[in-house]
Amino acid sequence: MKWLCSVGVAVSLALQPALAEDLFGNHPLTPEARDAFVTDLLKKMTVDEKIGQLRLISVGPDNPKEAIREMIKDGQVGAIFNTVTRQDIRKMQDQVMELSRLKIPLFFAYDVVHGQRTVFPISLGLASSFNLDAVKTVGRVSAYEAADDGLNMTWAPMVDVSRDPRWGRASEGFGEDTYLTATMGKTMVEAMQGKSPADRYSVMTSVKHFAAYGAVEGGKEYNTVDMSPQRLFNDYMPPYKAGLDAGSGAVMVALNSLNGTPATSDSWLLKDVLRDQWGFKGITVSDHGAIKELIKHGTASDPEDAVRVALKSGINMSMSDEYYSKYLPGLVKSGKVTMAELDDAARHVLNVKYDMGLFNDPYSHLGPKDSDPADTNAESRLHRKEAREVARESLVLLKNRLDTLPLKKSGTIAVVGPLADSKRDVMGSWSAAGVADQSVTVLTGIKSAVGDNAKVVYAKGANVTDDKDIVTFLNQYEEAVKVDARTPKEMLDEAVNAAKQSHVVVAVVGEAQGMAHEASSRTDITIPQSQRDLIAALKATGKPLVLVLMNGRPLALVKEDQQADAILETWFAGTEGGNAIADVLFGDYNPSGKLPMSFPRSVGQIPVYYSHLNTGRPYNADKPNKYTSRYFDEANGPLYPFGYGLSYTTFKVSDVKMSAPTLKRDGKVTASVEVTNSGKREGATVIQMYVQDVTASMSRPVKQLRGFEKVNLKPGETRTVSFPIDVNALKFWNQQMKYDAEPGKFNVFIGVDSARVNKAEFELQ
């Protein structure tokens, strides 16, 4: 794989503008050398130059270049985001070297969340793989392509635990589970940063959004978060800490308030927890325009007050506003912000630039000018093989009645639906520098898979939505939803005619990518009515109906589950999505994905998640009782539980065996099962291990994921899968906010999803 190759690019500094001899050199990338270097550099800087380092601005095609040139000349910019080509980045770094007094390099950042030019499945899809090797692949390829474009940092990974699918940004995260999110976030940081973010094909990560952004009330974007410290530290904080412990150089601070205090002005969060308790040494970055929003939050009286509060609370870099540059000079002059506080913020920024290797070579991620690609979007710059492999693993088979899947590569296949041939939507939101024309749609993938062996007929069938208000809202800044010029009846009739002449119908339905994005919260998480009408009409033809879902959140699918013969959850699968989906539909790849979020039966169940507390009156489906924790108009559990996903083969999991009945605090026990492929096809499944603290000083979840392993087995093959358990897997923040494990009985559950498990037990001494 080209991204694993050791590419020795000798950067000829002779081709770049002259560098300051006393600033640039072969500096050791050690904390001691960095601290001495930055201390000396700070002594040479004016107040305005220090403030300039704290400013992070967006530079896109619409920005006035001359104004930016003057800001760079005057040292008023510390970093730039949203510039994504080597040529454009080089111009601005050249301006620093040619025009500014101290020649302090800029760093360049972008939202490389699930790929740069090659777009991988959205993070929720990647989480469905339950495969850390897939995460590593996405991280390394994304970093390679980002660095190859001249970028130094990415605003990723997003590790906000979310249990509310109404929230549009659930698509960016790894789901509802703390352990899974922490494990995947940690792995992504390690993969993207490599041995060092200074390496030619690595980038520095920025864990986001600190903190608890995924818990906004009602799933409504930018809303408030209010929760107990126990819930915060047990369920929401571990993924951030895991990413920082893995070495992430930056943290993006959330836009929400937490227990009444905006995260942007929360010194307890940014200093007491982040710096003092966790020992974080990198930079904190405000989210877009967050400092000025403190006024609307009601925690700052005016712009100057907002800047004072933000800086003193621990915000190092201000993203996309002019508040720091406008108001910090006066605040420092008046003494309302001390020079020590300004120096501390500037030091953090200079530290990460040092760690990026920019003071050794400000062009380290650019190379010599004559190496710039002639075509930034050249096909040769993509990593299609890796994208297809990862996309396959992200797909989750939700239903397969009477072995409807895999399909035969013969006969006539109707491919219908508003998302079946959408190059933009298959990429998902936050698709970075990906080019829609380079993505493979489901229709294209199916045609490629069957070749001349089958006839494929296509009909759009419906718009994603016919709700004019929703279309207007989603298309406010860009065309996120396309509306066909034909009437709904004309499109529906075309789809029905296509279905009637076919042996099987594949309907690609769900959400446009813009419906599962920032500022895209929903109160209704069913498939839009226009598409529900299409599904009903297709069902009425009597032809076998396969639903291919394309969406960025769990959807309420009770009706569709009744109508469809098979359902394949594909999320937004990326550049190679169409080929990967076709691989699964026709059996060239046996699906192995598992759900990282529970699928509710209706929006009224939200939040529904597997690791809930038992309550004093738990509902028992075998012995239903009115006076238990339940709804009277809806079944209690989700439609599809966390960890769920089918295969084209079957698996048998044995009883759980414990290596010992007791666990000492300085030891470990091992829980093991025998897993057998009891079907007729080779396939993989994810064996999941959950733990329950039966009796504790405070109520604990009914089960919590503490390990998983994907195993591939041939028909009849059996393998032992073992999970070590130590005291760290049992610790929690108790009522006194002490992090510890309490002696007593623990249950261990192992199975193929969170509902179908076998149980054993042990005791912690």
Q: Where are these predicted regions, by residue range?
A:
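Short glycine/proline-enriched turn or capping motifs at secondary-structure junctions
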Residues: 3, 755-758
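Gram-negative bacterial Sec-dependent N-terminal signal peptides
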Residues: 1-19
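Glycoside hydrolase catalytic-domain context in secreted enzymes
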Residues: 20-734, 740-754, 761-763
